[in-house]
Amino acid sequence: MTDLRHYDVIISPVITEKSTMISEYNQVAFNVAPKATKPEIKAAVEALFSVKVKAVNTIVRKGKVKRFKGIVGRQSDVKKAIVTLASGQTIDVSTGL
C-alpha cells in the first residue's frame, strides 16, 4: 500500500471531549473512509504515525435527516475508528501529519 492510500484511509482525527477522555486508555479516534476495513486502518495508522496498533474498533454514525427551506435532505454517514495503541505508544493528534 502506498502512502497516498494511507492518507485516503485516514480522513481526520476526532477531537471531542469524549475522544480526549479515551486517550487515558491509550486510544485515539479518527474519521476514516466509509469503505475502509479494520486491517487497512491499522496499516495506515502504523505507517503514518510509526506506532504499534493493538486493536481497531469501528463505528458508523448514520447521517441525520435535515430540512432546509422545506426541502428534506440527508447528511452523509460518517465512519469513525477507535484505535487502541500498544502500551507505551502515543500519538499527538494536535500536530499535523
Swiss-Prot record:
GO BP terms: translation
Signal peptide bounds: none
GO cellular component, one term: ribonucleoprotein complex
Superkingdom: Bacteria
Keywords: Ribonucleoprotein, Ribosomal protein, RNA-binding, rRNA-binding
Protein's UniProt keywords contain Ribosomal protein: yes
Molecular function GO terms recorded: rRNA binding; structural constituent of ribosome
InterPro entries: Nucleotide-bd_a/b_plait_sf (IPR012677), Ribosomal_uL23-like (IPR013025), Ribosomal_uL23/eL15/eS24_sf (IPR012678)
Entry's family note: Belongs to the universal ribosomal protein uL23 family.
Functional description taken from the UniProt entry: One of the early assembly proteins it binds 23S rRNA. One of the proteins that surrounds the polypeptide exit tunnel on the outside of the ribosome. Forms the main docking site for trigger factor binding to the ribosome.
NCBIfam families, A to Z: PRK05738.1-3 (NF004359), PRK05738.1-5 (NF004360), PRK05738.2-4 (NF004363)
Quaternary organization: Part of the 50S ribosomal subunit. Contacts protein L29, and trigger factor when it is bound to the ribosome.
Name this polypeptide is given: Large ribosomal subunit protein uL23
